[in-house]
């Protein structure tokens, strides 16, 4: 029986889900808006909300807890420095999910998950490894 089982399995092992949501949370904090499937967005929302609450609490123990959940120190720094100050007066509800139609290949329901009052310029910034240094050296 499924009594008390509230989370979706998403056809993945527990380790895969944990790693996937850690990566998705880091991507959402980095870009402040990501496009994913609707069930993944609905599962990601409480994870990110709890991370923002950790950032608002501040302190070394909360920072270490966020690092253990997200495994990306740069995004934890942004979480504690930028997002915590942005949402210091908001009591929850830091993210929104907007339905975005259906994916062409498999007709999966897609959604945009983004931060409320997000920085529009953050989207697409600092994506991937820097390749300008290699071009300057050549």
Curated annotation (Swiss-Prot):
Disulphide bonds in the chain: none
A Pfam family of this chain: Ribosomal_L17
One GO molecular-function entry: structural constituent of ribosome
This protein's record includes keyword Ribonucleoprotein: yes
Keywords attached to this entry: Ribonucleoprotein, Ribosomal protein
GO biological process: translation
CC annotations in GO: cytosolic large ribosomal subunit
Assembly: Part of the 50S ribosomal subunit. Contacts protein L32.
Entry similarity comment: Belongs to the bacterial ribosomal protein bL17 family.
Full protein name: Large ribosomal subunit protein bL17
Source organism per UniProt: Bradyrhizobium diazoefficiens (strain JCM 10833 / BCRC 13528 / IAM 13628 / NBRC 14792 / USDA 110)
Upper lineage: Bacteria, Pseudomonadati, Pseudomonadota, Alphaproteobacteria, Hyphomicrobiales
């Amino acid at each position: 029986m499924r009594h008390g089982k509230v989370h979706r399995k998403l056809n993945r092992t527990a380790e895969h889900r944990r790693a996937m949501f850690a990566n998705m949370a880091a991507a959402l904090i980095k870009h402040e808006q990501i496009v994913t499937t609707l069930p993944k967005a609905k599962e990601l929302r409480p994870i990110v909300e709890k991370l923002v609450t950790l950032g608002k609490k501040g302190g070394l123990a909360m920072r270490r807890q966020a690092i253990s959940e997200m495994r990306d120190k740069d995004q934890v720094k942004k979480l504690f420095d930028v997002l915590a100050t942005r949402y210091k007066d908001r009591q929850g509800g830091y993210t929104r999910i907007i339905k975005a139609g259906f994916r062409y290949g498999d007709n999966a329901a897609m959604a945009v998950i983004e931060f409320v009052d997000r920085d529009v310029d953050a989207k697409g910034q600092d994506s991937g490894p820097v390749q300008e240094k290699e071009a300057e050296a050549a």
